[in-house]
A protein has these predicted regions:
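ER/Golgi luminal nucleotide-sugar-dependent glycosyltransferases, focusing on the catalytic module
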Residues: 1-497
Length: 497
């Protein structure tokens, strides 16, 4: 058995994540040769990663998307050389896994010698064509998905396939790639009399979804022995999921991978944190944690108190709220260092007197310029003092005097305080969340949803300053999404990346 693997890779910086090398390590066990085709850049780190598996690495101009990457690899061998292989596998870095050995799939498909080409999974097509552009059909045909497709020797030797690739036009866009290659390849060659199949059979899901690997990946992995899943499952726009589901596919997939497979979850987190906006994976995975007000893990809580550096940063402006602010701080472990900023020199001794008998390791009060409210104080004066700590919490006294009736603002503060620091056990449980999850960077309370704040929730957390913020970001040349954080939060100063 001689099997060639063609692996297509694109990443804007040319960096190769560990999930890719994990995939290639298993794939390579089933190959005689591997060629990697990179569109655009390949960093030194990326080249070293691929060099574990092959010396045949092609770096080409970022043109033609995946189609021309595959064409480049095929052209580099030539049809005579390609005809020496029993199978040619074309796959790419949009897949993650495997959760079971790929050998199972290769062995099972090799038993069917009637096939000319085969793949991992199928798209069941659509009665209309959702893609704009150069349609070959007025509907979307059933097709093998291009993330994993295999050609048999007799298919490679056939002039029809050779002419198809020799005459492939330049691909100008993703839509062009779908219309000219992925969505039509299977039908075009089926119509010519060639036989095909897929490893993951989903005919029973035709009425359920046209895209089983994205919409019900857990079912495919658990019940249909699918070895691979889509990276896109975690990065897909939630709005697109909500057209067909309640958003549960990605959450179910994550839970299944974590609880029922040996797949290293670090591989997912490292890639998501490096390449995705936190807003997206937080929303897609519904990363909301409910923290109990009674200690759940005494051993971990004690370890944190003994071995971790804990800080509480506070910005205190309202002296008539000193008692409640002190009560908040009193819920933190005695090993805590407290850093307080305030807006005037006359407030400093009041705060120092109020906090003098607090059972904590230290209290430091600093007078700061009265600009930027609590945010300016935190970013400019408090945050630099927290870098040597493992865990830190930030809060400020909250009155919201601009709201009417005053109960609206008071309840804002209640929501924040109750969720951040209900009692001493609650604080320890929050810190335990960080201790158990090295990738967790920030925990913050939910939006207040009462009174006028209800509309802020409906607008994604923004109030009247949304347009001002958009203008500021445009002036600064910022293009990325904003990460909206409440001004009460816990943070871990050193996280895994």
């Amino acid at each position: 058995m001689k099997r060639l693997g063609i692996f297509f890779f694109y990443e804007k910086n040319g960096d190769v994540d560990d999930f890719i090398t994990y995939y290639l390590a298993d794939l390579n066990k089933n190959l005689t040769e591997l060629v990697v085709v990179c569109n655009g850049k390949l960093s030194e780190q990326g080249r070293a990663a691929f060099s574990q598996f092959t010396d045949n690495i092609i770096v080409r101009e970022n043109k033609g998307l995946d189609v021309w990457a595959y064409k480049t690899a095929l052209d580099s061998y030539g049809w005579a050389k390609l005809s020496e292989f029993d199978e040619i596998v074309m796959t790419n870095s949009t897949l993650m896994g495997p959760v079971r050995p790929l050998k199972e799939m290769f062995d099972a498909m090799w038993e069917n010698q009637d096939l000319d080409f085969w793949g991992l999974s199928i798209h069941h097509g659509a009665k209309s064509n959702p893609f704009k552009g150069k349609h070959l059909y007025n509907y979307l045909p059933v097709h093998i998905q291009s993330h994993f497709i295999v050609y048999r020797r007799r298919f490679v030797q056939n002039p029809a396939l050779q002419a198809y690739w020799d005459n492939m036009p330049m691909i100008e866009s993703y839509t062009d790639s779908v219309q000219r290659y992925e969505a039509v390849f299977t039908k075009q060659f089926e119509d010519k009399g060639f036989k095909w199949d897929v490893y993951v059979k989903t005919d029973d899901l035709k009425d359920f979804t046209d895209y089983p690997l994205l919409v019900c990946p857990t079912l495919l992995l658990r019940e249909k022995k699918c070895p691979l899943f889509k990276r896109r499952s975690f990065m897909h726009e939630l709005e697109a999921y909500l057209n067909d589901t309640a958003g549960e596919p990605v959450q179910e997939l994550y839970d299944y991978l974590r609880d029922e497979t040996g797949y290293p979850m670090d591989l997912i987190w490292k890639n998501m944190i490096r390449t995705m906006h936190p807003h997206d994976f937080t929303r897609n995975l519904a990363l909301t944690r409910i923290i109990e007000p009674t200690v759940l893990d005494e051993a971990t809580a004690q370890s944190i108190r003994q071995n971790r550096r804990i800080a509480l940063a506070m910005h205190l402006y309202f002296m008539d709220m000193l008692d409640s602010s002190k009560a908040f701080a009193a819920k933190f472990p005695p090993e805590t260092d407290i850093f307080i900023s305030t807006s005037s020199a006359d407030k400093k001794p009041q705060i120092e007197t109020a906090f003098a008998d607090l059972n904590v390791r230290s209290v430091t009060v600093t007078v700061v310029e009265n600009q930027g409210r609590d945010v300016g104080a935190f970013l400019c004066d408090l945050a630099p003092q927290l870098r040597d700590y493992d865990y830190a919490c930030f809060m400020h006294d909250k009155k919201a005097i601009q709201t009417r009736p005053g109960s609206v603002g008071a309840s804002f503060g209640y929501v924040c305080n109750e969720n951040v620091c209900k009692n001493a056990a609650h604080v320890l449980n929050v810190l335990c969340e960080f201790e158990k999850d090295p990738y967790l960077g920030i925990l913050c309370p939910p939006y207040p949803t009462h009174g006028l704040y209800f509309m802020n929730m409906c607008s994604g957390g923004w109030g009247p300053n949304f347009e001002n913020t958009k203008k500021l970001m445009k002036d600064l040349g910022e293009q990325e999404k904003e990460l909206i954080l409440r001004r009460y939060f816990y943070g871990q100063t050193q996280t895994e990346t």
